[in-house]
């Protein structure tokens, strides 16, 4: 295979990149992932959480390579030489289509040309303007690229090939859970990666299954995922600053359309270009967003500068109501809260912030994790059954000056 490159990784140690993979990694399309943070605004709560989609993608490639090699040894003939090469590359490229700030900006509120990151990834792989497309064609040929996309999408291939990189027990989740836990310093849960990798088998119908003797390893993995959502991904500062960023960009678009705010070319591409090409999309990173938002802190518009000032200097952060609310309860108290906030001299629209939280728990049956005997793992684990319910609640933020009055009002409605 020629020369190899060794990369030292904080989570996995030495990662080995074969020569063909190195050529993919060295493209501009892939190097862009160095400038997209894995956890968006989590660094406001966890200062060390500035790791990127680049390091995560290399880690997923590493785990996919390990798992494929192990499965080939234990299940001879199940994975062809071509697929053994393509599955790790598919894992490497699984996040190639992420927008700036990852999932946070993956919304039509921000992008005038909206598509999910999986769709943008496919467009980048196929667009002749993108250097990654030409490198893949050179290395894999057109049929190889078609097979690569089929594996990434799970179309026309053995299910387990896709499940290695996208399922409820995939190498993507293995890497980001352990990496995010390590780098945020969140000492909770944890799972035995080595045991989990060894527990994965291939069923007769071509699905990934786990040994009944490894249920405890899967339990630890799923419980860790549950804790990470509670403590990190749904942290109140992460949720609040995410809203600040999205609202700042929405306001910037409004001001631009009214002629009162010039936008940089890349910001126009994101907010106003309804015919955004994959090549132009693949030039968007966190860096230009941060630079523009910091400039807006001095703008004359109080709404735009208010959001930008909070993000750039942490001045005047809104405070969370110390009451557990569901979405329906928030809607019931919204108008009274807006009236109270307005009477206190604040903006009832921009100073009442609702951050809904919703995350599906473990999904059983067709999408679930199956044992070798065909049962869903939930049937053999009361613990997994207990975390299969959907998590849904709301965070409400208001100015500090009126938080206590708002809490009194909400409590009066909930009686």
PLM regions and their residue ranges:
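Histidine-centered, transition-metal-coordinating active-site segments
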Residues: 1-86, 96-415
């Amino acid at each position: 295979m020629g020369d190899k490159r060794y990369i030292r990784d904080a989570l996995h140690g030495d990662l080995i990149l074969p020569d063909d993979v190195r050529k993919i990694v060295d493209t501009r399309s892939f190097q862009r992932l160095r400038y997209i943070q894995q956890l968006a605004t989590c660094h406001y709560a966890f200062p060390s959480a500035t790791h990127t989609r680049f390091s995560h993608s290399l880690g997923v490639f590493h785990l996919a390579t390990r798992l494929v090699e192990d499965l080939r040894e234990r299940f001879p003939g199940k994975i062809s030489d071509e697929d053994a090469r393509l599955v790790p590359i598919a894992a490497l490229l699984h996040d190639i289509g992420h927008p700036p700030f990852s999932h946070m900006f993956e919304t039509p509120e921000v992008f005038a040309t909206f598509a999910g990151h999986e769709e943008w990834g496919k467009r980048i792989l196929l667009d002749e303007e993108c250097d990654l497309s030409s490198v893949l064609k050179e290395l894999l040929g057109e049929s190889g690229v078609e097979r690569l996309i089929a594996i990434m999408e799970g179309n026309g291939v053995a299910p387990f090939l896709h499940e290695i990189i996208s399922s409820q027990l995939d190498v993507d989740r293995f890497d980001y859970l352990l990496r995010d836990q390590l780098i945020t310093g969140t000492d909770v849960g944890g799972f035995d990666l080595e045991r989990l990798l060894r527990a994965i088998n291939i069923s007769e119908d071509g699905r990934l299954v786990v040994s009944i003797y490894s249920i405890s390893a899967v339990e630890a993995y799923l419980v860790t995922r549950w804790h990470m959502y509670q403590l990190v991904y749904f942290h109140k500062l992460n949720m609040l600053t995410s809203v600040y960023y999205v609202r700042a960009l929405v306001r910037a678009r409004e001001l631009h359309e009214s002629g009162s705010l010039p936008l940089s070319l890349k910001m126009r591409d994101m907010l106003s270009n309804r015919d955004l090409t994959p090549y132009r999309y693949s030039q968007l990173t966190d860096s230009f967003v941060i630079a523009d938002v910091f400039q807006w802190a001095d703008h004359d518009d109080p709404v735009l500068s208010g959001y930008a000032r909070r993000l750039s200097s942490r001045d005047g952060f809104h405070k969370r109501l110390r009451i557990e609310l569901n979405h329906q309860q928030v809607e019931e108290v919204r108008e009274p809260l807006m009236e109270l906030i307005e009477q206190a001299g604040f903006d009832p629209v921009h100073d009442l912030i609702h951050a809904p939280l919703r995350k599906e728990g473990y999904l059983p049956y067709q999408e679930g994790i199956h044992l070798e005997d065909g049962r869903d793992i939930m049937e053999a684990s009361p613990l997994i059954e207990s975390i299969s319910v959907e998590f849904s609640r709301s965070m409400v933020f208001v100015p500090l000056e009126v938080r206590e009055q708002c809490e009194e009002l909400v409590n009066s409605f909930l009686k």
